[in-house]
From Swiss-Prot:
ATP binds at residues 18, 170-172, 235-236, 244, 250-251, 267, 271. The lineage of its organism: Bacteria, Pseudomonadati, Pseudomonadota, Alphaproteobacteria, Acetobacterales. Disulfide bonds: none annotated. HAMAP family: S_AdoMet_synth1. Belongs to the AdoMet synthase family. Residues 103-113 are annotated as: Flexible loop. This is S-adenosylmethionine synthase. Keywords: ATP-binding, Cytoplasm, Magnesium, Metal-binding, Nucleotide-binding, One-carbon metabolism, Potassium, Transferase. It comes from Acidiphilium cryptum (strain JF-5).
Length: 395
């Protein structure tokens, strides 16, 4: 995204009932079950969901008390919470196959710490984090509002509110924002596709959703009515895993910054925090957000890279996109390394990641969320590093 000039930028989100998000939810449910039993459990759980079928596959290392029957039960509870009790996909009737097996010893030997050896990364890879001053959450505005629309629709649906009457779990949103001199000033178009009960008309759903969406946006930001597209094909009754097969890890741009920042390619859900695809991406977001919160820049991208079995990052890169305020990039890279231990273990300890905190991340974005000290969730969204960054640069 450009820092100056006039342009349009679009991001999309999907609801927790989208097939890929159902898969993400189940994978993170499995992960949390293992971490609740053993904070040092290893999990890489992939889920496939289709018409009345759920398949769990992958690798784990943890307590034998976590049985396949228990995991199947948890998968049903996850589907029930999302709200699927339909003929083609129901928490009651779906057949569940649990095909998880032990983690490879060849991977474990590179990750486990022994003697004085530091714990290595679980794989090679590159990870990115990003923050900007467009919203209070320090997130890009298009993805922020795309998430907000669907979260609100889901909240109302689950409590039986009339403002979401007849809506079903599967939904998508897409928000196009107009930028003037590099700053968001309003929407030019919004798309909302939502599964619904049979018999509801397109006009009825649009009339129900327009005030809901309008109240979530800043004053004057709502697009013209002819640019507010609701169920553009006219009907969306068959949805969820009965309409499309869902797989873990297929919504990585929705999960992060909506295309406003680079992505290293690794998905998050179902992976324990020894997998730097997840934990290092969380740390990069934490660092970038604190750079912006400290007032050192209004935009910040951070990249790190790792090799399997090697504890320290091979590289740390910072880009403030020309928005820095008397801050040298090389100096900032050094300061970040000094303030935070960027080994896999250091990341997990700093952000307290060895806990069952991942189910809430499985929909509506891993970033831009509110940290909850009681639940221990979204610790990477805290800005507690900002004072140290300010001090390091004499602010």
């Amino acid at each position: 995204m450009r820092d100056k000039g006039d342009y349009l930028f679009t991001s999309e989100s999907v609801s927790e009932g989208h097939p890929d998000k159902v898969a993400d939810r189940i994978s993170d449910t499995v992960l949390d079950a293992f971490l609740a039993a053993d904070p040092y459990a290893r999990v890489a759980c992939e889920t496939l969901v289709t018409t009345n079928r759920i398949v769990l596959a992958g690798e784990t290392r943890g307590p034998s008390t976590i049985t396949r029957e228990y995991l199947a039960h948890l998968a049903r509870l996850a589907v029930h919470d999302i709200g699927y009790e339909q003929e083609g996909f129901s928490w009651r009737d779906a057949k569940i196959d649990v095909l998880l097996h032990e983690q490879s010893v060849d991977i474990a030997v590179g990750v486990d710490a022994a003697g004085n050896k530091d714990e290595g990364a679980g794989d090679q890879g590159i990870m990115f984090g990003y923050a900007c001053s467009e919203t209070d959450a320090l997130m890009p505005a298009p993805i922020y509002y795309a998430h907000l629309i669907l979260r609100r629709m889901t909240e109302l649906r689950k409590i039986g509110d009339a403002r979401a009457a007849g809506l079903l779990p599967d939904a998508k949103s897409q928000v196009t924002l107009r930028y003037a001199d590099g700053k968001p000033v309003g929407t030019t178009s919004i798309v909302v596709s939502t599964q619904h009960e049979d018999g509801m008309s397109q006009d009825e759903i649009k009339a129900m959703l327009r005030p809901l969406v309008t109240e979530l946006l800043p004053d004057g930001w709502m697009c013209p009515d002819d640019q507010f597209y609701v169920n553009p094909t006219g009907k969306f009754v068959i949805g969820g895993p009965d309409g499309d097969c869902g797989l873990t890890g297929r919504k990585i741009i929705v999960d992060t910054y909506g295309g406003a920042a680079p992505h290293g390619g690794g998905a998050f859900s179902g992976k324990d925090p020894t997998k730097v695809d997840r934990s290092a991406a969380y740390m990069c977001r934490y660092l970038a957000k604190n750079v912006v919160a400290a007032g050192l820049a209004t935009r910040c991208t951070i990249q790190v890279s790792y090799a399997i079995g090697v504890s320290h990052p091979l590289s740390v890169y910072v880009d403030m996109h020309g928005t820095e305020r008397d801050v040298d990039h090389a100096r900032l890279e050094t300061v970040l390394r000094e303030l935070v231990n960027l080994t896999p273990r250091g990341i997990r300890e700093h952000l307290h990641l060895n806990r069952p905190i991942y189910v809430p991340t499985s929909a509506y974005g891993h970033f831009g969320r509110e940290p909850d000290d009681r639940l221990g969730t979204f610790t990477w969204e805290k800005t507690d590093l900002a004072p140290a960054l300010k001090a390091a640069f004499g602010r």
